[in-house]
């Protein structure tokens, strides 16, 4: 009888231990499942971060590409501005040469006008001499008349020359006015061109500053891309580690489930043995 009681106590103790182990196995299983879910959540979070890192890398790559395109456009604008400056300098030189030629034509016209005035004075003096001789010497009337006709012819010729010179003078004055107007326009244009040149120079300096700024940004983007690449590698490593951890935990869960099943079988066997013992006691 004592042996049976002792055996029953041992069976009860084994049953309690089996229950404790079963509960512990259940707790371990739940903890493993919680840890597995936590790792799965971390894996999803890491995958999202990885996707965000890839998107950010694409964004910086696109920004770097835009910066390079803007830099190329700035260099093209600077080249075009230099070509415009050279063209404007050539135009200024042509205007200055045309102004010099106009001034030379004006000086020639003034000289011809002075010569015409001298010829007119000489003609007037000749007519006075002829008239004086006509008054003093009537016997030489025919000669004087001839001389008078000649003088008139000379005077008429001089008048024609004077009119022609005057007409040419008007034309020359008109040319001079146009030349002065063109000179004023040229001076105004030169001032505008100088102002445009200053603007182009300032724009060129601004473009150079922007190019330097873009170069600095490019270095910064390259450094950020390098940092992001390192973070990407680190995230990939963590993701791989998390996947391996999940695999291990899944295997641990399977092992725990197997152990739980074995404990249940053992508990069932102990319960059956305990029932048999109770039946034996009842029979006694």
UniProtKB/Swiss-Prot annotation:
- Which segments does the entry list as coiled coil? 1-284
- Which residue positions does Phosphoserine occur at? 45, 174, 186, 206, 252, 271, 283
Gene3D superfamilies given in the database record: 1.20.5.170, 1.20.5.340
Q: Name one GO biological process term.
A: actin filament capping
- What PTMs does it carry? Phosphorylated at Ser-283 by DAPK1 in response to oxidative stress and this phosphorylation enhances stress fiber formation in endothelial cells.
- One Pfam short name: Tropomyosin
Q: Where is the composition biased (Basic and acidic residues)?
A: 12-38
Q: Which residues carry this modification: Phosphotyrosine?
A: 261
Q: Where in the cell is it found?
A: Cytoplasm, Cytoskeleton
Q: Which InterPro entries match?
A: Tropomyosin (IPR000533)
- Cystine pairs annotated here are none
Q: Is Metal-binding found in the keyword set?
A: no
Cellular compartments per GO CC: actin cytoskeleton; actin filament; bleb; cytoplasm; myofibril; protein-containing complex; ruffle membrane; stress fiber
Output one GO MF annotation: actin binding
Transmembrane annotation, as ranges: none
Where are the residues of the annotated region Disordered?
Answer: 1-38, 116-136
The job of this chain, per UniProt, is described as:
Binds to actin filaments in muscle and non-muscle cells. Plays a central role, in association with the troponin complex, in the calcium dependent regulation of vertebrate striated muscle contraction. Smooth muscle contraction is regulated by interaction with caldesmon. In non-muscle cells is implicated in stabilizing cytoskeleton actin filaments.
Q: Could you say which protein family the record assigns here?
A: Belongs to the tropomyosin family.
Query: Any domain commentary?
Result: The molecule is in a coiled coil structure that is formed by 2 polypeptide chains. The sequence exhibits a prominent seven-residues periodicity.
Protein name (Swiss-Prot/TrEMBL): Tropomyosin alpha-1 chain
| GN (gene name) | Tpm1
């Amino acid at each position: 009888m004592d042996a049976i009681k002792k055996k029953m106590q041992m069976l009860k103790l084994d049953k309690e231990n089996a229950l404790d182990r079963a509960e512990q196995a259940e707790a371990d299983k739940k903890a493993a499942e919680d840890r597995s879910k936590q790792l799965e959540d971390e894996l999803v979070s890491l995958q999202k971060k990885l996707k965000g890192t890839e998107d950010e890398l694409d964004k910086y790559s696109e920004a770097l590409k835009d910066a390079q395109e803007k830099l190329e456009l700035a260099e093209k604008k600077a080249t075009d501005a230099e070509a415009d400056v050279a063209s404007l300098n050539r135009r200024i030189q042509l205007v200055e040469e045309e102004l010099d030629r106009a001034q030379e034509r004006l000086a020639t016209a003034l000289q011809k006008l002075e010569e015409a005035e001298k010829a007119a004075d000489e003609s007037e003096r000749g007519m006075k001499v002829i008239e004086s001789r006509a008054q003093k010497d009537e016997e030489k009337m025919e000669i004087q008349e001839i001389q008078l006709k000649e003088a008139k012819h000379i005077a008429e010729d001089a008048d024609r020359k004077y009119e022609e010179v005057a007409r040419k003078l008007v034309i020359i004055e008109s040319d001079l006015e146009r030349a002065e107007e063109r000179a004023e326009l040229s001076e105004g244009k030169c001032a505008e061109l100088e102002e445009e040149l200053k603007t182009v120079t300032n724009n060129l300096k601004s473009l150079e500053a922007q190019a330097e700024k873009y170069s600095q940004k490019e270095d910064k983007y390259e450094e950020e891309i390098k940092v992001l690449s390192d973070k990407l590698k680190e995230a990939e490593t963590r993701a791989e580690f998390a996947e391996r951890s999940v695999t291990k935990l899944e295997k641990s869960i399977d092992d725990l489930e197997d152990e739980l099943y074995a404990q249940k079988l053992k508990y069932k066997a102990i319960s059956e043995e305990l029932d048999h013992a109770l039946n034996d006691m009842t029979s006694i």
